[in-house]
């Protein structure tokens, strides 16, 4: 059984309004026992923070090296976490560590929850899948519509 804990990660100072909307929707729709907002350097102010600061069960947790202990990886994830620069790559490693050690449901800060996860929590595990999207670099090409046609049209 999966713990009724939602985990969000934010690496950076300004927590956005959209992140606040994501966490607020998860809280109101799913009603988890706890919500972890694991962060690095996040300021507890601004529009996003104002939306979540009063949520019952919200735990604002700074990233710690101890999150990476006990992964049976000889410290590789922790070393990579401190070596990598891209926030998305660092968040991937942190997500792996948190779910492995503590369990729960990880959600990105751009996910709007519209239905509770109660049935999914009864499973040993689950994963969400997003539809295939066009790469961002495509729209920087000389004629993006040509690529759009090739990728999307039958």
Residue ranges and their predicted role:
Residues 1-17:
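N-proximal low-complexity "stem/linker" segments adjacent to membrane-targeting elements
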Residues 35-41:
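Short internal beta-strands
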Residues 14-17, 41-45:
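Acidic-and-aromatic substrate-binding clefts and catalytic sites of carbohydrate-active enzymes
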Residues 23-33:
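Short, acidic, metal-binding catalytic loop of nucleotide-sugar glycosyltransferases
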Residues 44-93:
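Active-site-proximal specificity loops/subdomain of glycosyltransferases
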Residues 16-24:
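Short amphipathic alpha-helical segment that frequently serves as the phosphate-/nucleotide-binding helix
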Residues 86-134, 138-146:
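GT-A fold catalytic core of metal-dependent nucleotide-sugar glycosyltransferases
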């Amino acid at each position: 059984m999966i713990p009724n804990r939602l985990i969000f990660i934010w690496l950076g100072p300004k927590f956005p309004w959209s992140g606040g909307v994501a966490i607020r929707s998860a809280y109101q729709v799913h009603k988890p026992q706890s919500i972890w907002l694991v962060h690095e350097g996040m300021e507890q102010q601004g529009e996003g923070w104002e939306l979540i600061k009063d949520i019952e069960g919200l735990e604002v947790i700074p990233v710690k090296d101890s999150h990476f202990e006990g992964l049976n990886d000889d410290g590789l994830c922790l070393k990579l976490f401190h070596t990598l620069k891209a926030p998305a790559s660092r968040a991937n490693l942190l997500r792996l560590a948190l779910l492995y050690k503590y369990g729960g449901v990880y959600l990105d800060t751009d996910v709007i929850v519209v239905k509770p996860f109660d049935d999914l929590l009864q499973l040993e595990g689950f994963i969400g899948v997003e539809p295939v999207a066009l790469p961002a670099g495509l729209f920087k090409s000389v004629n993006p519509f040509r690529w759009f046609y090739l990728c999307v049209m039958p």
